[in-house]
C-alpha cells in the first residue's frame, strides 16, 4: 500500500521532533490526559499534527481547526482524518464563514482545555460560547498576537479561566520567533516569488524577535535591510546590529520589498503604497492579515490581477503597482511550509508539558495569564541540548558560596 502525501509528511515531522519523542514515551505510559477533551486552533500542518497526536497518545480526545484560513495543509488534514481518526475541521483557502464555523465545530467537543494560536478560539468562548467556560480548566496560547489579546482580556477583567502564555517562554520566543520566523518567512517569500534576495533593499517592520530573525536572515543572504520601529530601544538595537532605521513612508520609497512582523494593523498604509517603487513586494509575517492595509488597497485599486499562484498585483489610483503575497496573510504558512520541524519540536514540547501542568494544577490557578513554569522551560532546553551533543559546566561548592555572598570583593 502506498502511503499518502499527508501520511508521509506526518512521518517526516515525527522523525525530526526528538524532544516530542522523549515526551511521547512517558505520555504513552502514564496517559496524563485520560478523560480530557482538547479543542485546538492551530495551523493544521505536519508539525501541528504530531503535537495533536501526542496529546491523543497521552489519552486526550482532540478536535482541531485551523487558526488561519490559508495555513492548512490539505494532505495532512486528510491523513489525520483517515489514517488517525482525528476530527479535523480545516482546509486551505477557507472562507471567513467556514473559518468561524470550523472553530465552533471544534468547540462542540465541550473542551476541558483549549489550545489556541492568535486568540480567535478563546474569543469565541468568551463571547458566543460562554456556556462552555464553566467546564474549561484553562488553556495555552502560542503566539504574540494571541498573548496581546489575552493580556487585554485580563486587564479588562473578562478572562474566564487561566491561560498560559507559551509564546514568552524562553525556549519558544528565543528560537521559534527568531530562528523559525527568520527562515520560514524567507522560504515563503522565495517560494511565492522566485526572486533573488541578494542586492535587494528590504524593509522589515518591527524589531521584536520575529523581526530581528527576518532581518538577520536577509542580511545573511545579501539584502540591504532597513528597519522600522515605534520603540526607541529596539530601534537602537537595530542600528547597532548594522541596520538603518527609518519611518515607513520614507523607507518604502527605496524598498524592493517590505516584510511586516509587528502584530499591529495598518503598518503599511495605502498612502505608503502610493509612494512605493513600482511592483514592490509586500509580505506579512504576523498572525493577522491587517498589517498591510490590504482591504483599503484593494478597495481603492483600479485593477487587481493574480500574477503568480500566491501573488496579486494591485494598480493604484496614481498608476503605481504593488504586489502582495497571500492576501497579506502570514507568508510562511500561506506560501510555504511554516517553521522548520526542529523549531516546532521545541514549541510543541512546551505546549504539551504546560497542558499537562494545567491538568495537574488547575485547582490552584486563578483567572489570569500565567507564564510557562520555569522548570518546564529548562527541562525542554536540557533535553534539546543533550540531543545536540552539548555539555554544561557545573558550579562547585566554592563558586556557589561566592555567588550567594556579598562581602567578597577585589
From Swiss-Prot:
Chain sites annotated for binding substrate: 117, 142, 172, 176
S-S pairs: none
Binding-site residues, NAD(+): 143-145, 177, 206-211, 229, 285-287, 332
Cofactor detail note: Binds 1 NAD(+) per subunit.
Keyword NAD on entry: yes
Enzyme Commission number, as recorded: 3.13.2.1
GO cellular component: cytosol
Record keywords, A-Z: Cytoplasm, Hydrolase, NAD, One-carbon metabolism
Xref: SUPFAM superfamilies: Formate/glycerate dehydrogenase catalytic domain-like, NAD(P)-binding Rossmann-fold domains
UniProt KW Hydrolase keyword: yes
First-listed, main subcellular location of the protein, grouped into a coarse class: cytoplasm
Gene name of this polypeptide: ahcY
Known function: May play a key role in the regulation of the intracellular concentration of adenosylhomocysteine.
Subcellular location: Cytoplasm
Listed NCBIfam families: ahcY (TIGR00936), PRK05476.2-3 (NF004005)
Pathway: Amino-acid biosynthesis; L-homocysteine biosynthesis; L-homocysteine from S-adenosyl-L-homocysteine: step 1/1
GO biological-process terms attached to the record: L-homocysteine biosynthetic process; one-carbon metabolic process; S-adenosylmethionine cycle
Protein name, as recorded: Adenosylhomocysteinase
